[in-house]
Amino acid sequence: MTLRLTNTLTRRTEPFTPLRPGKASIYCCGVTVYDLCHLGHARSYINWDVLRRYLIWSGLDVRFVQNFTDIDDKILKRASDENSSMTAVSERNIDAFHADMDSLGILRPDSMPRATQCLDGIRALIGELEAKGAAYSAEGDVYFAVMKHAGYGKLSGRDLSEQQENAGGRVADAEGARKQHPFDFALWKAAKEGEPSFPSPWGAGRPGWHIECSAMVRAELGDTIDIHLGGADLVFPHHENEIAQSEAATGQELAQVWMHNGMVNVGGQKMSKSLGNFTTIRALLESGVSPMTLRLFVLQAHYRKPLDFTAEALEAAATGWKGLNAALGLGERHGQSLEWPATPALAPVALVAPSNHPSEPLEPLQQRFIDAMDDDLNSSGALAVLFDLAKPLRALANRLERGDRADRPADELAALALRWRLLRDLAAVLGLRREADSESSGPGDDSTNQDEIQAAIDARIAAKSAKNYAEADRIRDELKAQGIELIDKPGGITEWIRR
């Protein structure tokens, strides 16, 4: 099986074949830096970090570019509210973005261009569009003429003629009067009094949002790239407009694959700053949620599906991570006493290729992991493999933590060492790393109590494996009486929540 990805452009799940053998070029739409990032941003960038890591692990040379929008109406408003400057607001939030992403283990992009640093390329691209008749100037503004681009709407499936009919009752404004068509959009905005501006052939002003990404893709990666990434809320108008601008200028396809992640929902509504129902990454981490718990919470759902944010779901993720973290820590905490061979620390990007694991009994598990990831990045299926790998390791870790001896044959301990190494390597593909106990606690965590609960769950799993269902039911009922409800999931995963 080869990697198959769902392409928003074709509305199909297709085999991924890079434009250049052995290489992959990826552009990810970044944040507008006027505020701290929320959980919706974390979801997007964790998902795309996993895509990048998996491509690297699969042997591709990946160039990953993600931009910053550092000039925008929202930034200017924030600067005005704070009696600050556009630059001060942008720099503060860029620093905060890096801190948040680093805490979540998200690899830094190879390049992170800023709109204000790419003005020459932006102006040049606008000039090309104007020379080709795809753009026109009006009173210092420059607009893209959507009716001049025959393919407009191919990403979102929108029909301009239908939209024009539905827009018949719109109230005209000054900008509308300058446009040749209601859905033409700004490439360059004339300067307004009191706002930062930059020189251009059309007069002082600043770029529109959509043209920034088109110019940065071209400057960093060329006219056609392998994969373009973003949230589902960017399909229209942002990505639709990107395609129109870039393809009108170059005559070539902008990206062969367009991928979009689903939204995070709170109470049935999309999490967003405009609705005021957002939770920042920083607030979550400061509340006691560990970075890897948050990462596991995101990866339990498929990247294209909505993700419901609830306290119960977050607590369940904390429970799952605690068991996985115990297994990941086995080699570091007890490897020497188990006489396991020393293994080098895994570098963030130096991921181990599949062929480096010759151990025959583990190959089916590794293949299950690969099959899941090849199936449009089925991260929940990949996590199920990690939990399967972790089961005997976690049981051994629990015994050793209680001071028990690891009385097992040498060949069995050697097999467990290989199992642990594979767990660590595959976890790294998902960006999951072992956390110290102080990091890995969840919201309202009582470490001793959680250890006891996990030990009971392990005993129940062992009882079920031995077909001692009466004992398994007894353990379940005993936990239920303590307000602990067990949730058995596919792949042999057992999670728990407090009632």
UniProtKB/Swiss-Prot annotation:
GO BP of this protein: cysteinyl-tRNA aminoacylation
Cofactor binding description: Binds 1 zinc ion per subunit.
Cofactor(s) needed: Zn(2+)
Keywords of the record: Aminoacyl-tRNA synthetase, ATP-binding, Cytoplasm, Ligase, Metal-binding, Nucleotide-binding, Protein biosynthesis, Zinc
Ranges in coiled-coil conformation: none
Keyword Protein biosynthesis: yes
Record motif 'KMSKS' region, residues: 270-274
Location relative to the cell: Cytoplasm
InterPro entries in alphabetical order: Cys-tRNA-ligase, Cys-tRNA-synt_Ia_DALR, Cys-tRNA/MSH_ligase, Rossmann-like_a/b/a_fold, tRNA-synt_1_cat_dom, tRNAsynth_Ia_anticodon-bd
UniProt: Zn(2+) binding residues: C29, C213, H238, E242
Molecular function per GO: ATP binding; cysteine-tRNA ligase activity; zinc ion binding
EC number(s) reported in the record: 6.1.1.16
Amino-acid positions noted as binding ATP in the UniProt annotation, renumbered to this chain: K273
Bilayer-crossing regions: none
Keyword Cytoplasm: yes
Entries under Pfam families matching the protein: DALR_2, tRNA-synt_1e
Annotated catalysed reactions: tRNA(Cys) + L-cysteine + ATP = L-cysteinyl-tRNA(Cys) + AMP + diphosphate
Motif ('HIGH' region) on chain: 31-41
One cellular component term from this protein's GO annotations in UniProt: cytosol
Family, as annotated: Belongs to the class-I aminoacyl-tRNA synthetase family.
Subunit structure: Monomer.
UniProt xrefs under NCBIfam families: cysS
Protein name as it appears in the record: Cysteine--tRNA ligase
The organism's taxonomic lineage, starting at the top: Bacteria, Bacillati, Cyanobacteriota, Cyanophyceae, Synechococcales
